[in-house]
């Protein structure tokens, strides 16, 4: 037998390389075949619930890194909650109605305007379901576990029926009404938009100053050559002007410039004078805003049209002139002010953004709104009322799908009246927990300031508004009509609205005093898609999915404060008086490595599927766990490669632990905590602290800290310390020796507990690790998080070993200096004498009996007494003297020893090794030992 054959060298089939792109798919198939998701829930039946309700991604195309961040975060939460013992189901969902589906069909050459509506909607449904299947495959490949065979999908009949009932309950409670008021209008989509469907981009717009001649100053202001001065960026709205708003609290000045007089906000006077080039002007009169109410101005270029002066507190002195041009059909503030003063709504624009015959200037009829800016400018100039024209760049509202500008346009729509139950919504926000905490203020302010919600859309693909109209135009919505439509939708889906005549959509024998002839028509608009997803708390119940209401958590990107968090809150409070969620967790956006938004034009997008093919889903999952996703997070191939280095460190550490516990049977070889060596007890205590802190961080949804704690423990406590000196015990000591079994107990515990703690983050790899451990559960996911132990001596151990670690730092510094001086090479070539200070000596006394030589990996260690030699190095905790070790290297333990050949039967070994080999391999005494 050779010397190396007497060593307890670790062996394992756990591969160094994960080969993740290939093997992950095999593990995922095994999860599904073995029904681990269902079995985990079965284990937790009857336990406290944790329901994370999935915000439905839109079913359109393969997933991107934002999807990966979101879905993996949810999976980490659900897995960790289940491993904590909660009953935590996960039901994935999809949002499947809306304009993007219609746009995709248009790209395929489908023209909805030439098709039967029901047939067109069937094409939409088919396309949407194809996208669901595509994304389902993508999400599962990320290692996301859930009830993938029974998702909730907004186009499913039972879901649509539930949505109809939500609408009906809101109508019954008095929260739904029809009105004509300005809403975001997308001429490119020919539909209204919700606030959540609007995004902002920089555009170049006109900036013009216009004078309105005073017609009636109410005895307070001269009409002769006197003008109200306004500023606007939308010349195309000037023909529809109905009034001028002034702030009742502001001071206004009448200034003389040449032969004209202008009324301007006093605080804006100097800025306006500079812009208009008034080198000299004279203030001739002061007015209060309240003085000007009900004064009348002439339209700046249309004969016979007047403009009423009205009070409005929203008028600011931040820009403009302090007087605001008002057109009721093209602005929410304009509308509200005009209504207070008894005006009819004037909105002379069609669905495509072109002016209708209602426009007071016939020259503009049929023209696209922005094309009229130059015409209006020229007419103002000809009338002598254009004082200044320039352009400027500013942020303007755009359709989030078409990327085209949108306008405020007054149209007849259906609304949810937020103002009627705003206080209830705000009260529910106060009762909700937010991660991060600032989310509460953000959502609160959004609800506090938001207007009523326009819920009707002029599109084809969506859930129809379940409204009928009588012969006299009266809208009909009753409990009976809602239930009849909902029951029909539950059986046939919402296409029934378009395949059945109105008589079959109404309850049998339905009559109304508003239809003496029994004739009815049905609404052609559909519900806003945000009403679809906003009703998901109800739809998922109607589908019989395992999600309780109110649910434990909603988790989505921070854009959903004005989207899904918002719409879900409104529908739930409106129908049931409670928020649909107990907590809300929001995430930032995924940016590239330089902090830029990802876009195809910049070429900086990363597809999760491409990363999976190159590196594996585990690397994406570890990236998700490593970042603080409460804000925006960067991702690039370079960043992912750095993450993969961290993964490699974790994997290699597990490989070492598995190899060196391969001959350890926890049932018979385990050493009880009280019998462990003190250094091993210390590591058990450190491991226990790690488990406790990790679970706390899981409960705070702070996965970045879980990862940091684990990685720090693996790197510092294990690799750089415990496992570094472990070889001297694991390889050298007797196979069944107390020292070796004591250390193996700790290493095995570390492998088990770290596998459990990392399982929610790295389920593929930790499942693989689990297969090499001797635990009763078939998979790590079927186990629970480690129990947190109560070690009575934990604080004393941490204090004593903490002092020793400071002493160790001093010794390592001394060894490094000796290495620099070429006195030694490796640390085992050294003989070290330590003269400890008081704190270190006290710690060493408490740790009496420990083999500090072994821990410091030196051949000889002496605790010096008496006077410190001059050549010793002075450090914080001790003085350290390093000399080259005497003797020869033992070929087995690699330490310098002076007792080689002490046992004549094994002359090449030191006394320690000879004793161990004789005990473990007595046959060698007969056969002899080769080098």
UniProtKB/Swiss-Prot annotation:
Catalysed reactions listed for this entry: tRNA(Ile) + L-isoleucine + ATP = L-isoleucyl-tRNA(Ile) + AMP + diphosphate
What Enzyme Commission number(s) apply to this enzyme? 6.1.1.5
The listed location of motif 'HIGH' region is: 57-67
Which is one Pfam family of this protein?
Anticodon_1
Q: What class of enzyme is it?
A: ligase
Name the needed cofactors: Zn(2+)
Give the residues the record marks as binding Zn(2+): 890, 893, 910, 913
Where does this polypeptide localize?
A: Cytoplasm
Textual note on the cofactor: Binds 1 zinc ion per subunit.
Q: Which residues bind L-isoleucyl-5'-AMP?
A: 556
Instruction: List where the protein spans the membrane.
Output: none
InterPro entries, alphabetized: aa-tRNA-synth_I_CS, aa-tRNA-synth_Ia, Anticodon_Ile_BEm, Ile-tRNA-ligase, Ile-tRNA-ligase_type1, Ile-tRNA_ligase, M/V/L/I-tRNA-synth_anticd-bd, Rossmann-like_a/b/a_fold
Cellular component, GO, one term: cytosol
Q: Where is this motif: 'KMSKS' region?
A: 597-601
GO annotation (BP), single: isoleucyl-tRNA aminoacylation
Binding residues for ATP:
600
Kinase listed as a keyword = no
Q: Domain description from the entry?
A: IleRS has two distinct active sites: one for aminoacylation and one for editing. The misactivated valine is translocated from the active site to the editing site, which sterically excludes the correctly activated isoleucine. The single editing site contains two valyl binding pockets, one specific for each substrate (Val-AMP or Val-tRNA(Ile)).
Query: Record's family?
Result: Belongs to the class-I aminoacyl-tRNA synthetase family. IleS type 1 subfamily.
Q: How does it assemble?
A: Monomer.
What role does it play? Catalyzes the attachment of isoleucine to tRNA(Ile). As IleRS can inadvertently accommodate and process structurally similar amino acids such as valine, to avoid such errors it has two additional distinct tRNA(Ile)-dependent editing activities. One activity is designated as 'pretransfer' editing and involves the hydrolysis of activated Val-AMP. The other activity is designated 'posttransfer' editing and involves deacylation of mischarged Val-tRNA(Ile).
Protein's name in the database: Isoleucine--tRNA ligase
Instruction: Please name the taxonomic classification of the source.
Output: Bacteria, Bacillati, Bacillota, Bacilli, Lactobacillales
What is this protein's gene name? Answer: ileS
